[in-house]
Curated annotation (Swiss-Prot):
Name under which the protein is recorded: Cytochrome c oxidase subunit 7B-heart, mitochondrial
Catalysed reaction equations from the record: 4 Fe(II)-[cytochrome c] + O2 + 8 H(+)(in) = 4 Fe(III)-[cytochrome c] + 2 H2O + 4 H(+)(out)
Subcellular location: Mitochondrion inner membrane
Keyword Membrane included in the entry's annotation: yes
UniProt GO BP: oxidative phosphorylation
Organism field: Thunnus obesus (Bigeye tuna)
A GO molecular-function annotation: cytochrome-c oxidase activity
Subunit structure: Component of the cytochrome c oxidase (complex IV, CIV), a multisubunit enzyme composed of 14 subunits. The complex is composed of a catalytic core of 3 subunits MT-CO1, MT-CO2 and MT-CO3, encoded in the mitochondrial DNA, and 11 supernumerary subunits COX4I, COX5A, COX5B, COX6A, COX6B, COX6C, COX7A, COX7B, COX7C, COX8 and NDUFA4, which are encoded in the nuclear genome.
Amino acid sequence: SNTSHQDFHLFYGDNGMPVH
């Protein structure tokens, strides 16, 4: 349940922008 920062990179990437 520690996917807070991981989910951020998965969805927003390194630039903090939505990868979708």
